[in-house]
């Protein structure tokens, strides 16, 4: 298995797809990296030479924040918003959607499983 910036790339996948296993590298950055290093995107990871791996590693580490550095930066940004008391920080603290999504229905991913409130019944019609 080839390792780049601390991530094992799947051997059987095309390089263009395998690079997206790195946190911070999506399809666009993978294509940019392959174009800049001159490595074929159709190459399988198992067929990579050591020179290609070194070129990819140097380009990714030199030009992008990925994996641990990026995760720390995102966590620090969220922590800063919580500390200075912005609306987004408040939403993060309460575990609610941050980017304006509705919460009357849905939002179960952020809110977690439903909690039944005792004594609350649906209003009946007279």
Curated annotation (Swiss-Prot):
Cited InterPro entries: Rbsml_uS13_C (IPR027437), Ribosomal_uS13 (IPR001892), Ribosomal_uS13-like_H2TH (IPR010979), Ribosomal_uS13_bac-type (IPR019980), Ribosomal_uS13_CS (IPR018269)
Disordered, as annotated region: 92-126
Keyword rRNA-binding applies: yes
GO MF, one annotated term: structural constituent of ribosome
Segments forming a coiled coil: none
A Pfam family hit: Ribosomal_S13
Classification via Gene3D superfamilies: 1.10.8.50, 30s ribosomal protein s13, domain 2 (4.10.910.10)
PROSITE patterns: RIBOSOMAL_S13_1 (PS00646), RIBOSOMAL_S13_2 (PS50159)
UniProt GO cellular component terms: cytosol; small ribosomal subunit
Residues in the signal sequence: none
Keywords tagged on the record: Ribonucleoprotein, Ribosomal protein, RNA-binding, rRNA-binding, tRNA-binding
Swiss-Prot/TrEMBL GO biological process terms: translation
Self-association and partners: Part of the 30S ribosomal subunit. Forms a loose heterodimer with protein S19. Forms two bridges to the 50S subunit in the 70S ribosome.
Entry-linked NCBIfam families: uS13_bact (TIGR03631)
Family designation: Belongs to the universal ribosomal protein uS13 family.
Protein's job: Located at the top of the head of the 30S subunit, it contacts several helices of the 16S rRNA. In the 70S ribosome it contacts the 23S rRNA (bridge B1a) and protein L5 of the 50S subunit (bridge B1b), connecting the 2 subunits; these bridges are implicated in subunit movement. Contacts the tRNAs in the A and P-sites.
Protein name (database record): Small ribosomal subunit protein uS13
Species of the source: Kineococcus radiotolerans (strain ATCC BAA-149 / DSM 14245 / SRS30216)
Chain's gene name: rpsM
